[in-house]
Amino acid sequence: MGPLTIRDVTVEFSLEEWHCLDTAQQNLYRDVMLENYRNLVFLGIAVSKPDLITCLEQGKEPCNMKRHEMVAKPPVMCSHIAEDLCPERDIKYFFQKVILRRYDKCEHENLQLRKGCKSVDECKVCKGGYNGLNQCLITTQSKMYQCDKYVKVFYKFSNSDRHKIRHTEKKTCKCKECGKSFCMLSQLTRHKRIHIRENSHKCEECGKAFNQSSALTRHKMTHTGEKPYKCEECGKAFNRSSHLTQHKVIHTREKPYKCEECGKAFNRSSHITQHKRIHNREKPFKYDECCKAFKWSSALTTLTQHKRIHTGEKPYKCEECGKAFNQSSALTRHKMIHTGEKPFQCEECGKAFNRSSHLTQHKIIHTKEKPYKCEECGKAFNRSSHLTKHKRIHTREKAYKCDEYCKAFNWSSALTTLTQHKIIHTGEKPYKCEECGKAFNRSSYLIRHKIIHTGEKPYKCEECGKAFNQSSHLTQHKIIHTGEKPYKCEECGKAFNRSSHLSQHKIIHTGEKPYKCEECGKPFNRFSYLTVHKRIHAGENPNKYEECGKACNHSSNLTKHNS
């Protein structure tokens, strides 16, 4: 037998045969023929490209189509072979009729190998007629094999051997660029597109290119908004079948992925992969700059984002105000400030939020659920942050400490409070009023101060119409109408409508005089009394009688004089 040629692995159809095939069968023929040709090119056997291959590459009908019918009926099958026929009868018939039509001349009746036989030599049942079959194979220069693992038909040695590689997992095709190996040449060809960035499938809508047609098809759904995969349970739709499959687990509550280490179960394979790293403490994504490591598979993105902390890079810029961010999600959230968009709405009360996390926290108000419980005392909370704060009561932990060693703060929010506290020592007042130049050490103080210039009093009493420039003043005022006195003295039972009034009253019982004059040492139980007393030393008499011009250092003395 001569050397292998393209003719040996070519199967030709008549025009009638070709039009009898459906689209799937025609595509199967194209794929097989093109792959055979690529294999010959890879082995250095094929020199020139036949017209048939050119037509197939261009998606046209095969150019070398025979104009006459070669054979009308398939070979006759042995009785013992018929018992082992696979359910894919149509595909087998297709190959028997078209690919094996030349065997009709053969004296040996059985040209189909018994299921489980890998070659002609192993088929013991048909061994009696082997000489006739062998003669036929030499004449037609073609062989047919059936793999015992999958129902597939192969012609020539190259196809059969190539198929066996898939089962043995032998990877003979290696990428010179990155060293990755593949079983099939076609797989290597597809892989090479990653390196050469061959993006032959381009989106007409946005110009984005892909190296696979299936990827382009999925991408197009982004523009059309098409979601063909719908959940029968709740009606939710998805643009990928895999996403629907993952979603269905929510309804079945199935958790098929179980950790062998601790027995914990998960509904996604990716979740168990992440979980396993807890046991082996694996953190594969590490940053060389600060040695910080990340353990989740998604941390490759997190690592990229983390690097921006060191580089200071902020590639995502707001077109509205110019503010830049180091994460695209942060920019998306920021844009809602300009648009006023609040897409996350509570179904219970209609309140809307610009973040899904805020809506989740809000919903707990309606359910009154308190899922975060203190193991120490049993107290429950509706937020994890509240539980974290509460735990510090038991540990007496004060994580945020002033460097001056004067005060410590135990709340997580105290990081801001600590920053504000430090200003007391530095005397810094970074918040300045543009109207009068007065400076403050807190932004909230400046906001309250500005109301003096504007005269604005946004907090109005619904009872009497009186307005205030601070909400706290309105709250205190409302007590006048209700007559409520919530602050009660434990010593004598006297009640007050302000906590500050109760604090002043308590000094009567203790006899304490905490406010001392630095000039003469005289103590007072109220700060206001000390302020008035200091005027004696300063010689200041701010309270003047208009009739006679006499001045007093205390308003009460002026009142007495007037009477």
UniProtKB/Swiss-Prot annotation:
KRAB domain residues: 4-75
Which GO terms fall under molecular function for this chain's record?
DNA-binding transcription factor activity, RNA polymerase II-specific; RNA polymerase II cis-regulatory region sequence-specific DNA binding; zinc ion binding
Question: Which Pfam family is an annotated match for this chain, by its short name?
Answer: zf-C2H2
Q: Which Gene3D superfamilies match?
A: 6.10.140.140, Classic Zinc Finger
Keywords attached to this Swiss-Prot or TrEMBL record, sorted alphabetically, are: DNA-binding, Metal-binding, Nucleus, Repeat, Transcription, Transcription regulation, Zinc, Zinc-finger
Mind telling me which GO cellular component terms the entry cites? nucleus
Keyword Zinc, does the record have it?
A: yes
GO biological process entries: regulation of DNA-templated transcription
InterPro entries in the cross-refs:
C2H2-ZF_domain-containing, KRAB, KRAB_dom_sf, Znf_C2H2_sf, Znf_C2H2_type
ZnF (C2H2-type) intervals: 173-195, 201-223, 229-251, 257-279, 285-310, 316-338, 344-366, 372-394, 400-425, 431-453, 459-481, 487-509, 515-537
Q: Where in the cell is it found?
A: Nucleus
Known role:
May be involved in transcriptional regulation.
Q: Which family does it belong to?
A: Belongs to the krueppel C2H2-type zinc-finger protein family.
The protein's name: Zinc finger protein 257
Origin organism is: Homo sapiens
Q: What is the lineage of its organism?
A: Eukaryota, Metazoa, Chordata, Craniata, Vertebrata
